[in-house]
Regions:
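Viral structural modules
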Residues: 1-373
Length: 373
């Protein structure tokens, strides 16, 4: 390795296990590397590492399920020598643990006066994680040339459909990929592909009237050139896996007793607090958001590829907060191949109230315009 052009690390949670008051989270870390070799060639490599994290969750035997999301906090690297690169990356793991809870209330009593209130509540049925694998081959080589070197691969994942059916949930995923490579004539070419995958998950209590929320990330991705029927390197094999986190919920009508009077009895009043997801609102819409990416110290001559990936989406105080990671591969004015990676944060107002909720947000498509300063 003579010079590192790009080193980026992304994380995805693949599974969790609860035991003895601790939530054990496991996942994959995907490292993508683009570098210049000592011979002046631009090369790329991809690596995968497994990670585990133990999180205290003292809910004892009442544990039901958990929502788990992971996003990249930072990635640093250090070139130790021409054959060894040290990569350090941090991730944030966001968890929400659900526990089974039983509450009793007085519903009817002779001689008692009850004050009752009707409430529409969101009952969480299940939350979890699963993976969808994909492995496809695509023909490339628009100018009848073979693939020489892969330079850069950009990809983002999309939830195409989430459908609730009796006792099950159908999730359809899609990945949009762009591969930049150099052919045998030393010309740089770019090709884009789409891969699909789907899975049916068992969810107890799920009906067609239920609501499902899902987010997807690319957990693993490997791209390599393979020979076609003429033994020419004009095909790409793309293999990997989607990591999907989901939440299933059902709207139910609940009757609550908020106060009671029993004058004819020697009664002791007991009150308590019950957490409820009341008066749910649902938003099914597509919005266009824009962000400015600044390259203050760089003059861009040509953009080879720009890739985006959803890092995190959550609802807080009536706002949809989104973090999107970006990667830009470009040539500077000196003809050097460069890359820039970062995270941009966007928000969208949903309601005027201070509400929270579950999110099934995804990136459908994007475009960009190169503007001069």
């Amino acid at each position: 390795v003579e010079r590192v052009v790009r080193c980026v690390c992304s994380h995805a949670v693949t599974d969790y296990e609860y035991a003895s008051g601790s939530l054990r989270v496991t996942g994959r870390s995907r490292i993508s590397l683009v570098y210049i070799s000592t011979s002046g060639c631009c090369l790329s490599a991809a690596f995968e590492e497994r990670f585990t994290k133990n999180i205290d969750a003292p809910v004892t035997d009442a544990f039901a399920f958990a929502q788990v999301h992971a996003c990249t906090d930072f990635t640093n690297y250090r070139l130790i020598n021409q054959r060894k690169l040290e990569v350090r990356s941090g991730l944030q793991v966001h968890t929400e643990v659900f526990a089974y809870m039983e509450q009793s209330q007085l519903t009817d009593c002779c001689g008692a006066i009850l004050r009752q209130a009707d409430a529409q509540c969101l009952e969480v049925l299940d939350a979890g994680l699963f993976s969808c694998d994909f492995d496809e081959k695509f023909a490339v080589g628009q100018h009848n040339t073979n693939i020489s070197v892969l330079i850069h691969t950009g990809a983002f994942a999309v939830i195409d459909e989430v459908r609730a059916i009796a006792g099950k949930m159908l999730v359809k995923c899609r990945a949009e990929l762009c591969v930049v490579y150099e052919n045998t004539e030393h010309n740089t070419e770019k090709c884009c592909f789409t891969v699909h995958s789907s899975k049916i998950v068992d969810v107890a209590g799920m009906t067609e009237d239920s609501h499902a929320f899902a987010q997807v990330k690319i957990g693993s991705l490997f791209v390599k050139p393979v020979p076609d029927e003429n033994n020419d390197l004009r095909r790409l094999e793309i293999a990997g896996a989607f990591c999907v986190s989901y939440t299933a919920a059902l709207v139910s009508d609940t009757q609550l007793v908020t106060d009671a009077y029993a004058i004819a009895y020697d009664a002791r009043v007991q009150t308590g607090t019950v957490p409820l997801l009341r008066d749910p609102q649902f938003f099914y819409d597509g919005k266009t958001l824009s962000a400015d990416l600044s390259f203050e110290d760089t003059e861009i001559a040509e953009i080879l590829d720009l890739s985006l990936a959803m890092q995190e989406a959550r609802v807080q105080n009536g706002l949809l907060l989104v973090e999107v990671g970006y990667g830009v591969a470009y040539y500077d004015v000196s003809g050097n191949l460069c890359c820039k990676d970062g995270v941009t944060r966007l928000q969208l107002a949903l309601t005027d109230g201070k509400c929270a909720g579950f999110v099934g947000a995804g990136l459908q498509s994007f475009d960009y315009i190169l503007q001069s300063a």
